[in-house]
Regions:
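Non-catalytic terminal regions with compositionally biased, polar/charged low complexity
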Residues: 354-361, 366-446
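Short, hydrophobic/proline-enriched secondary-structure or compact coil segments at domain edges
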Residues: 216-218, 305, 309, 396-406
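Short, hydrophobic/aromatic-enriched beta-strand segments in well-ordered soluble domains
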Residues: 263, 316-337, 360-372
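Aromatic-lined, polymer-binding surfaces characteristic
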Residues: 1-14
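A surface-exposed beta-strand-loop module
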Residues: 341-360
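Polysaccharide-binding surfaces and accessory modules of carbohydrate-active proteins
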Residues: 264-325
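Carbohydrate-binding/catalytic loop surfaces
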Residues: 20-46
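Catalytic and substrate-binding regions of extracellular carbohydrate-active enzymes
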Residues: 46, 52-284, 358-364, 368-371
Length: 446
């Protein structure tokens, strides 16, 4: 039973193209076509009750073992028993007893949109300092990326194919991931001896509704004296062309800090709604903890309470909308500083910096929309459907975020901060209206 569940978990941790999500020191491009997964699928089929869904994977792999397991798979495919392997939303717990955090994968449709949320344990020397980080995929293409590792495996010209120095100075560092950094210092001070003692904790996971799927987890040890809770929701609403992601990151700290929240995207910037200055010469953003590898390409200030950043990649449009404060800085960065051997990709990022505050909330939506065809030269639905994003309430008990569409409709997402039971009743009064619901969150009209 354990082996079969392990094979299923491996297959669930792949994108639409069968490539594994590059968690920790994972290599991008590694997929279920590798020989070890051919073996795993064949053996699991033979000894695990001949699950016909595994035949769908075997057909994708295009090869079988030359033994009893492979013959069983080949015959079953020949006899027309194959079924498609269903990718589903799943929450995988970490640790020998399943209590050391985990990895959650939220999916909409046939991998139309896939979110990977990592709140796991450190995982030995290959682990990264990336608590509560996430990545986002659309049909197998990275929208917001996890960098992966800095190694050119078995390519002799690059360090003999071994791990390169930048794997430690960049890829493992917190700022290399889509997660929160305090005071330009990595989680656990970037020390394995500290990180290996801790893990994040699940607050709740709910995929019972295909239209609103939510995962929430808490980290209290990455920065002593600071509690971070991140709630990620994948929402399919008729007001928007495609599903959108809502990201609520709540911080409670005993001291004022500098907070940096980066988002690593691909493609070409289309439009922003804030003014920014580009330096005459590029300089590193910092001196350590990965910051020494980031060039600062632009810096600006929010022009409104909702900051908008849009880009295009591979014929698709994306918009990030964030509820920003007037004192925030908006940074445009690019990887490549202090990299004399060109071991790093030149990847861009949009970073929100909030300085001199203790308790705070970051609220952000990531929206996929529209398309562009160079053949027809037609650009469709290039603009965001979100007019504004506002944190309308934050307390020890609840955080509420209002999403306003361009047509004027307003949706309200409320997450419970003190009780996460599935049947727990809640009441929150905002202005002259009270909202009642059961469970750890509420989404609906305002």
């Amino acid at each position: 039973g354990v082996l079969l569940r392990a094979v299923d978990a491996l297959l669930q941790l792949t994108d639409a193209d069968g490539e594994f999500f590059p968690l920790n020191d994972g290599q991008k491009g590694m997929s279920w076509h590798t020989s070890s997964l051919v073996t795993a699928v064949n053996v699991a089929f033979l000894v695990g009750g001949e699950d016909p869904r595994l035949l769908g994977i075997a057909e994708e792999q295009g090869q079988v073992l030359l033994d009893d397991a492979g013959i069983a798979v080949a015959r079953a495919i020949r006899d027309g028993k194959s079924q498609a392997f269903e990718k589903r939303s799943v929450n995988l717990s970490d640790g020998s007893d399943g209590t050391q955090g985990g990895v959650a994968v939220l999916r909409y449709g046939d991998d139309d949109l896939t979110l990977v949320f990592k709140y796991a344990a450190q995982r030995l020397s290959h682990g990264h300092y990336d608590k509560l980080s996430f990545s986002l995929y659309e049909k197998g293409d990275e929208v917001l990326q996890d960098y992966g590792l800095v190694r050119f495996v078995n390519i002799e010209q690059k360090g003999g194919g071994n791990y390169l120095p930048e794997n430690r100075s960049w890829a493992k560092q917190t700022v290399a991931h889509n997660t929160l950094v305090l005071n330009e210092t990595s989680h656990f001070e970037g020390k394995y001896e500290i990180g290996s003692q801790h893990h994040s904790d699940l607050w709740f996971y709910d995929d019972s509704s295909p239209d609103v799927q939510v995962v929430s987890a808490t980290e209290t040890n990455a920065y002593p004296g600071t509690a971070i809770r991140r709630t990620l929701a994948m929402i399919k609403d008729d007001a928007f062309e495609k599903p959108l992601v809502l990201d609520i990151l709540k911080v409670d700290s005993g001291q004022e800090n500098r907070y940096d929240l980066p988002f690593y995207y691909f493609g070409q910037v289309m439009k922003v709604n804030f003014e920014y200055d580009s330096p005459d010469s590029l300089v590193p953003l910092g001196e350590k903890s990965g910051y020494q590898h980031l060039y600062l390409e632009g810096v600006g200030k929010p022009a409104s309470e909702s900051t908008r950043f849009s880009w295009m990649d591979d014929g698709r449009f994306y918009t990030l909308t964030s509820a920003t404060d007037a004192g925030d800085e908006l940074l445009l960065t690019r990887l490549g500083a202090n990299d004399p051997d060109f071991n790093l990709r030149r990847d861009p990022a949009f970073m929100i910096r909030r300085d001199g505050v203790a308790d705070t909330v970051f609220a952000t939506t990531i929206e996929t929309h529209g398309s562009y065809s160079p053949v027809s030269e037609r650009a469709l639905n290039t603009n965001s459907s979100i007019a504004g994003l506002e944190i309308v309430h934050d307390s020890d008990d609840y955080t509420a975020v209002a999403i306003t569409g361009v047509a004027g409709q307003v949706s309200l997402f409320i997450v419970a901060n003190s009780e996460s039971g599935a049947s727990q009743g809640h009441v929150l009064t905002l202005g002259d209206r009270s909202y009642k619901w059961a469970g750890p969150y509420r989404y609906g009209p305002r």
